[in-house]
Amino acid sequence: MRAVLDTADIAIVALYFILVMCIGFFAMWKSNRSTVSGYFLAGRSMTWVAIGASLFVSNIGSEHFIGLAGSGAASGFAVGAWEFNALLLLQLLGWVFIPIYIRSGVYTMPEYLSKRFGGHRIQVYFAALSLILYIFTKLSVDLYSGALFIQESLGWNLYVSVILLIGMTALLTVTGGLVAVIYTDTLQALLMIIGALTLMIISIMEIGGFEEVKRRYMLASPDVTSILLTYNLSNTNSCNVSPKKEALKMLRNPTDEDVPWPGFILGQTPASVWYWCADQVIVQRVLAAKNIAHAKGSTLMAGFLKLLPMFIIVVPGMISRILFTDDIACINPEHCMLVCGSRAGCSNIAYPRLVMKLVPVGLRGLMMAVMIAALMSDLDSIFNSASTIFTLDVYKLIRKSASSRELMIVGRIFVAFMVVISIAWVPIIVEMQGGQMYLYIQEVADYLTPPVAALFLLAIFWKRCNEQGAFYGGMAGFVLGAVRLILAFAYRAPECDQPDNRPGFIKDIHYMYVATGLFWVTGLITVIVSLLTPPPTKEQIRTTTFWSKKNLVVKENCSPKEEPYKMQEKSILRCSENNETINHIIPNGKSEDSIKGLQPEDVNLLVTCREEGNPVASLGHSEAETPVDAYSNGQAALMGEKERKKETDDGGRYWKFIDWFCGFKSKSLSKRSLRDLMEEEAVCLQMLEETRQVKVILNIGLFAVCSLGIFMFVYFSL
């Protein structure tokens, strides 16, 4: 009989929803969502604790609870390799990539590629690829896994549940922006860890300890005779009934079908660089840090937290197979269909089955809230990051003169568009059931992301890499990967009791080896074409490579108080007013010619500094909130003051409420003095500065977390 929610369970779930919505509305009150950086980068005001929790929970979504536990049930420890690998790659993000992103002054990863190489070809290519991956892999898999848990554990209507969750998540993201996302992620991280640890302790106590888990897992084979008699199956064949011989090893022999160690090190690891160091969902959170110390601290915290999934998700999945062997390890497609509604296998129900059978009343509601937290955290991450990429890397190319207000509106409309696509994808997701969902995700990503990882690594570590090399190398890798992906879908793996008649290059070459080839072929083509074509300009590599860390060039000499402006890449327009020289700092993306024709009242974000004397006390047309708001890196450089005033005068209470609710206007957008603006610029300059004491502490943490990661790999692979 299917378990149902008790009154206590319902109360806990309801309390969770109330807390989440309260946090979202709190973010609406406290944050400045009416600017590009305020909405998309949380005003660069987040601490390492909040960002570290957000990094963890954004990655550990519902597909991890379903997919990781399912792969643990099907193949043992192997899937834990991705978690320990992430632990190490997070530090690569914090110590190498993030300083470059901050120094480059970018919001999105496509924007970085555009700034590093010039032009828009690579920017558009990467933006389109990211949106495809978000919508058709991350989003679809998250919805399926979350819906599977709800359906398996609670018996709720699948479509109503999914639509409700999507709607709440979209409302939270649209109203609060990244501040709301990070605040709620902090709550959800705590909730996830408590709930998952509780289930882990209960399940291990049920088995009798960790060593007993390993012993009994290797004996967890279904009773074929009993199953045939119980279900009266017409198909008496059985397959994949016994645990794999290397189930208790993580990195396995080179021909293993799950994790061959050469493929994982040479192919999967470089491919994972895209997710952890160049994926908007992850990087956008770290870019919201107050400074580089908080950014590094957040990756250290997330790295330590990545030790947990192996024990709180993978091991419970293995325990589920031990306790419910005949269901989790179904013997053939007909049996699997009767047990879980999927002919490919039933390992994906391992975690929800464990929850419903072992967790007592009350705690079951907590676990339900954990799964909702996982689903919503992933969805809000995708909604926010995808809308950022679309708004700043696609829409901005179409509407180059778009105001900051227009960008905010477009970002929110795109979230609504993604909601519609998500709901339309639900029927397709229900049919897209695989035996090991998590490995399915990795396979799709490994066909598309290795070329991107190669481009980012070459862009950062090799100054000679230019736009032509990156474009042709990236496109070659993309075409090869797309062809392999199409072939993989065209020649699907047969059911386990059927012969495999696929071509040898499909069935015998592991996807990690394909990823290896894509990564190195892309890199080779990029290097060759770059060497045969002109090198990049000095401006393109001035702040965008690893070797230009300290190279902040000052274009004009101003007074010491004005130095904070120099870290931004700006052109200087010199003009004369009443025999007094004035420097206007022109935001990126604007030429002098485009500025000269503007009237003072039409200019909103030109920052003025005088060469002699103190700055003026106030500047009537400056409304910048933070250093990032002032420049917006070319994204919101100019906004029409006249249009804003007209809208304010004509709008009634209703429109004022709508503006506040959606973050189009903010009570904090008062006129700012130039002195305040310069102080904020000083803070921006200090983002890359670290004291010696902080450096020592962070480096000790780096050594500790990397040592732990390597130890885990060795311990679980020998």
From Swiss-Prot:
Going by the UniProt record, its keywords in alphabetical order are: Cell membrane, Glycoprotein, Ion transport, Membrane, Phosphoprotein, Sodium, Sodium transport, Symport, Transmembrane, Transmembrane helix, Transport
Name by which UniProt lists this protein: Sodium/myo-inositol cotransporter
User: Where's it found, cell-wise?
Assistant: Apical cell membrane; Basolateral cell membrane
Q: Which GO terms describe its biological process?
A: D-glucose transmembrane transport; fucose transmembrane transport; inositol metabolic process; myo-inositol import across plasma membrane; myo-inositol transport; pentose transmembrane transport; polyol transmembrane transport; positive regulation of protein localization to membrane
Q: How does it sit in the membrane?
A: Multi-pass membrane protein
Q: Which domain of life is it from?
A: Eukaryota
**What is the protein's species of origin?**
Homo sapiens
Q: What is the lineage of its organism?
A: Eukaryota, Metazoa, Chordata, Craniata, Vertebrata
Q: Where is the signal peptide?
A: none
Primary role: Electrogenic Na(+)-coupled sugar symporter that actively transports myo-inositol and its stereoisomer scyllo-inositol across the plasma membrane, with a Na(+) to sugar coupling ratio of 2:1. Maintains myo-inositol concentration gradient that defines cell volume and fluid balance during osmotic stress, in particular in the fetoplacental unit and central nervous system. Forms coregulatory complexes with voltage-gated K(+) ion channels, allosterically altering ion selectivity, voltage dependence and gating kinetics of the channel.
